[in-house]
Amino acid sequence: MQRPGPFSTLYGRVLAPLPGRAGGAASGGGGNNWGLSGSHVQLPGRAHSETRGDKGGSSAGGPAPSTMSKAEEAKKLASHTAVENHVKNNQVLGIGSGSTIVHAVQRIAERVKQENLDLICIPTSFQARQLILQYGLTLSDLDQHPEIDLAIDGADEVDAELNLIKGGGGCLTQEKIVAGYASRFIVIADFRKDSKNLGDRWHKGIPIEVIPMAYVPVSRAVAQKFGGEVELRMAVNKAGPVVTDNGNFILDWKFDRVHKWSEVNTAIKMTPGVVDTGLFINMAERVYFGMQDGSVNVREKPF
């Protein structure tokens, strides 16, 4: 019997068409310059019309439709390859968030029907929960299944050491929880997400989930200590900031140089008011990149 998920009391089994990602949002513009040396903090201003995360959307100056079509095909190819290689019967699966994971869930559902697989799925967001329900998969949570066999998720950027930036869709904390309690964490992405260094291709910053009352002091602390710009992420289809599934705000830290990411991640997480960061350091075991030529490039964690 399927156990109701954590959102059942508030939302019920809502099977409406899925959004491309939870809490679609844009970076906040305008605001005050705090005058910090070598850095500044953006307070919320008018929201830009900019699609975030790995959804592949863009503003008027974005990629041509042909490029986007190739990227979508690449996502699908990477997702299906990862599912074929790693999903097995009697597993507890962590289901990530975003547009790439849609292809993975579709293939998982096909295999469940074709092979009569017995799988249990743990969502990383409201969007992931609805996706699991839409495709008729078995929904559960960490209360019932605290040990996860395999987590599959996308990424906004992957560096040469398989460090990740995640959280463009605002689900970073629950994504990190699920990945952290999984025996194996596999990432699926398209060719645009493959970088030598974090920040080479992803220019929207590292997301930081914060308690709402602390967003200003956290913004100042991060900018003062590490430089760059810190912005409160503003919503597109609502007035005010993006609110996560956990009821928190998101800051986007646009760093201006390469850092020792493990040290930076620890330091930011120790800042009072910070819930977690979108830096996934030393967590991914393998990344599947769908390429423009129809191939899949598989990179494993260096030892």
Swiss-Prot record:
Modified residues (Phosphoserine): 99
Any GO BP annotation: pentose-phosphate shunt, non-oxidative branch
Biased composition (Gly residues): 22-33
GO terms under cellular component: cytosol
EC numbers: 5.3.1.6
Chain segments carrying region Disordered: 22-75
InterPro entries: NagB/RpiA_transferase-like, Ribose5P_isomerase_typA_subgr, Ribose5P_isomerase_type_A
Pfam families assigned: Rib_5-P_isom_A
Pathway terms, separated by semicolons: Carbohydrate degradation; pentose phosphate pathway; D-ribose 5-phosphate from D-ribulose 5-phosphate (non-oxidative stage): step 1/1
Enzyme class, UniProt record, top EC level: isomerase
GO MF annotations in UniProt: identical protein binding; monosaccharide binding; ribose-5-phosphate isomerase activity
Keyword field: Isomerase, Methylation, Phosphoprotein
Name recorded for this polypeptide: Ribose-5-phosphate isomerase
UniProt source species: Mus musculus (Mouse)
